[in-house]
Amino acid sequence: MLDSKLVRTQLQDVAARLATRGYQLDVARIEALEAQRKTVQTRTEQLQAERNARSKSIGQAKQRGEDIAPLLADVDRMGSELESGKQELDRIQSELDQLMLSIPNLPHDSVPVGADEEENVEVRRWGTPKAFDFPVQDHVALGEQHGWLDFETAAKLSGARFALMRGPIARLHRALAQFMIDLHTREHGYEEAYTPYLVQAPALQGTGQLPKFEDDLFKISREGEADFYLIPTAEVSLTNIVAGEILDAKQLPLKFVAHTPCFRSEAGASGRDTRGMIRQHQFDKVEMVQIVEPSKSFEALEELTGNAEKVLQLLELPYRVLSLCTGDMGFGATKTYDLEVWVPSQDKYREISSCSNCGDFQARRMQARYRNPETGKPELVHTLNGSGLAVGRTLVAVLENYQQADGRILVPEVLKPYMGGIEVIG
């Protein structure tokens, strides 16, 4: 959530910056609500002062033996008007709050301005896509030939956009997640966490999925109980660890990592990536989250992105890094890098990680703060998150990049200890 004071005092500038994201801020509505709020607040304050004075005069009139009934009636009337004024203020503030919750984060000055993914800027590449001397198979064909990747049975169980993995491919999927967790905890300084997969609405509001993106979530409603939502990413549960907290500066940075399933309705993805594991309702992801002092968040973004890149480098998978333009960034991000891995069957790079600095946007929604050692006062932390990596898409990349002419799959060197010494699948 943006700073309401910033929105009030720099409304036109905020609107212009949001316009670069393709978001049209309802300036007229905000101005109208602010004008109403000021009018009602001024009237309420004047009425309160008048009521206080009238209450004081009751005692004085009583001492003089005067009839105080008219004064009492005035005080009661003013009390009713005050209550109405406070209710009106609450209504206006509630509408302003809902508006604020629907506004995306402001892009950082270093973010390239653009309308959509076509205007993202490539930052760097690593590795060279392999030139195969045989017809390349996609991961579906590679996995289905032995029955180890079974979309038909998954559809029988759950419908479209689910996968059933068996045998060595299931083991390879598990090996990838274990390798990622070990790398981030042993080499990159993250603390492993096991989090709930079901969260309630305040957690999703804190990280920005609610109220705007409820259609993208799977919701579980039970009569007489608060609704649950299946997490779309462990970013939700990991970041909300600090919700409502005032941290000691010495605790920062906090670095969490978790391997969880993620659940997404893919409401806007009709017709896209209908074959295979690229876009699923349920998929595993290793998620990294950092909670840092404000002055260190952009340095942390470079570190976080490098942590995700290291996974791809050790797996020897070619990839590129993009700086997302203003029109392609996620709702809560002030700056984002996407990592895209080479997928041979599609002859292009596909997203495998998104690493974002959210600034104080999520922290303000969650009221996550730290005590500034210089001032002694609580201030909002900055939050960052990134995939390290999406496990299913990494599996896709490994299957396709390590395939052999006979359909067998070589096991990447770094995964062999997790595969019980298996060197070839198939």
Swiss-Prot record:
Binding site for ATP: R264, S265, E266, E351, I352, S353, S354
Cellular component, GO annotation: cytoplasm
Residues reported to bind L-serine: T233, A234, E235, E287, S387
GO biological process: selenocysteine biosynthetic process; seryl-tRNA aminoacylation
Top-level taxonomic group: Bacteria
Location of the protein in the cell: Cytoplasm
PANTHER family the UniProt entry points to: SERINE--TRNA LIGASE, SERYL-TRNA SYNTHETASE
Subunit (UniProt): Homodimer. The tRNA molecule binds across the dimer.
Protein's name according to its UniProt entry: Serine--tRNA ligase
Gene: serS
